[in-house]
Amino acid sequence: MKGGKKLKDLYSPEAYQRISAYFKDSLKTALALYQNMKPGFLTALLYPKMMTCSSTISVDEAIMNLAHENNIGISGFETMAMQAAVFDSIPYEKQAEELLKVIDSIGNSLIQFKLMLQAYKDQQLHDIEKIINDPVFGVEEDRDLLLDKRNKHWVEQLKEIMKKGTVFIAVGAGHLVGKNGLIELLRAEGYTVRGLENRE
């Protein structure tokens, strides 16, 4: 974090202890290891814990592994520095509140995460948007920063990338939905966007 701020500086001793206990008991790691990390990044560490499958790798990793195995080139929309800048735009105190809220309501967070996965499998875009706007996810207030502006930037990149041939594009579900989601932005640019049958 900027200015030498530490994670423990953002919480009361009691709140910090609640987060520390969760990381120790549920994530099997010490919160002390993450003192310099932005709370928004720490919130992202919680999502694998909400997964019901036994896989130890993320979807991103699985896709990258497939690409490497088949000698397919990979490129990203953003650098780590660009992603960090997004979180620097949101006050650390606000990020800290969101992290605590997710941990304190972990039961509801788990339910919403499972609903999100099912809505994604069923290609129910309206349901996905409704879920990401739930206060549990802490996205709605900062949607412009976390999703909309980034989507618009990504579409400009995609217009150039797709000129080169067939591409596989993987993004988080939240980036797909809404009037400023990638689906509608691509349609506005004249692209035909349709769902494919989900075969399990």
Name each model feature, range by range:
Residues 140-200:
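A cross-kingdom marker for long, charged
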Residues 1-145:
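Structured, acidic catalytic/metal-binding patches in enzyme active sites
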